[in-house]
Amino acid sequence: MLAGRDAVTADPPSAATAPASWGRSTRRRYSIMLATAAIVIALDHLTKWLVTSHIPLGNQVPATNQIVNIHYIQNSGAAFGLFPQFTYFYVVVAVVVAGYILAFGPRMGGGLLRLVAFGCVLGGAISDGADRVLFGHVTDFIDFHFWPVFNVADIAIVGGMLVIVVQLGFGGGRPDRPPAERP
């Protein structure tokens, strides 16, 4: 109970009345998410730079096994190269996704894994979105022969979304509430 009010119907505290530790917790959650996004962006751009610097466009380099090749292509479409005429629509989608994650991601509840997942999606969206703005395409290079060619940002986006969807599917998606409002 909160000062004679039912905890279920009580309004959440404003920023002025929230405990100081709640603000630090939110900052910590944002820090984890943004650090993860920065790592994804750095890895994605490093790997793209290595590929574009050492492999001619369209060429393939077999890896040490028969499962994966490095195949340098430029993708102006969506996933799997679909709809290349909508390049700037994908930029808008990346901005909307990034904005949503920045606004609501750390407040969606869940633990460290979910924060890292949101950071992966954010980093992948920013990285591929930046490539579309700067170059008009995304560099893809990971080729498993049985699947369309993709990149590190794609792995981060798909992996992050998979974690988020699985966690939300198991009821872990309630927004964070201050300790006084928790059942």
Descriptions of predicted regions:
Residues M1-P183:
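Alpha-helical transmembrane bundles and membrane-interface segments of multipass inner-membrane proteins
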